[in-house]
Amino acid sequence: MARNSEKAQSMLFRFRAQQAADLGIIDIGRTRRPKAITSVDSIPACEKWRGQVLKEISRKVSRIQEPSLSDHQIRDLNDEINKLMREKWAWEMQIRNMGGPNYMRGSGRVYDDEGREIPGGGKGYRYFGRARELPGVKEMLEAAARRGRGPAEEEEDDGKTVGRGGDIATKKVDANYFGYGLDEEDGTLLAYEMQREKEAVEKLRKEGEDEEDVEDGWEPLPGDAGDGIEWRLPTLEEVQEELVDRRRRRLLEKIS
């Protein structure tokens, strides 16, 4: 009986493989998942590789629940799941860039190929199954829950800053906090801003008067000298005329 390596070298096997590649059909069971995700330029191929990654995630999430695993095995499994999550995100990014469906739209929740939601599959580094009960992890998750933050934010923070939504969730704030106030409609804010702008202009003008004269070779822009002349952009005809004059002067200098 021929070995698998000998079968792979046969003429018929290579012909069928080339024929399947030309038709866009890939047998995932006999093909390694490519590491260079951006090199795959077929949406069906990316869909199949993404499906394979989802199967591996689902299988490892089920395995991490086993009570016979040690803490080291649980940590290794959790690292592998997070690595697969990043790979899944890369495949989804490639699919979206090629014009395929946008799986990243619902990235807050992660589902396997059978439609079951995978708990803890959001953004950042996540803990799955028994990894949430590891020494140190459980305390960190409880502290993050009390602060109203995610575990990924809790890990990245050094304990000095406040995570996104941590303080806002515990305070009573209205629409004014998010910039939806009505102070612009009644003119209160606009009048205050105009007054502050006027004070800032007067302050700059006084500082400019106190400074020494402008250095040689420099001249103030129109509107900055306080002469009432506003700054005006030159028209296209004026720019072209200036460029022609400069070129004419350079030619005359070369001739002379």
Swiss-Prot record:
Record's keyword terms, sorted: Cytoplasm, mRNA processing, mRNA splicing, Nucleus, Spliceosome
One Pfam family recorded for the sequence: Isy1
Protein location: Cytoplasm; Nucleus
The gene coding this protein: isy1
Any one Gene Ontology cellular component term annotated for this protein: post-spliceosomal complex
Family classification: Belongs to the ISY1 family.
Subunit structure: Associated with the spliceosome.
Primary subcellular site in the record, as a coarse category: cytoplasm
GO biological process: generation of catalytic spliceosome for second transesterification step; mRNA 3'-splice site recognition
Organism placement in taxonomy: Eukaryota, Fungi, Dikarya, Ascomycota, Pezizomycotina
InterPro entries: Helix_hairpin_bin_sf, Isy1, Isy1_sf
Bias kind Acidic residues: ranges: 209-218
Entry keyword annotation includes Nucleotidyltransferase: no
Region (Disordered): 145-167, 201-232
Protein name: Pre-mRNA-splicing factor isy1
Chain's role: Involved in pre-mRNA splicing.
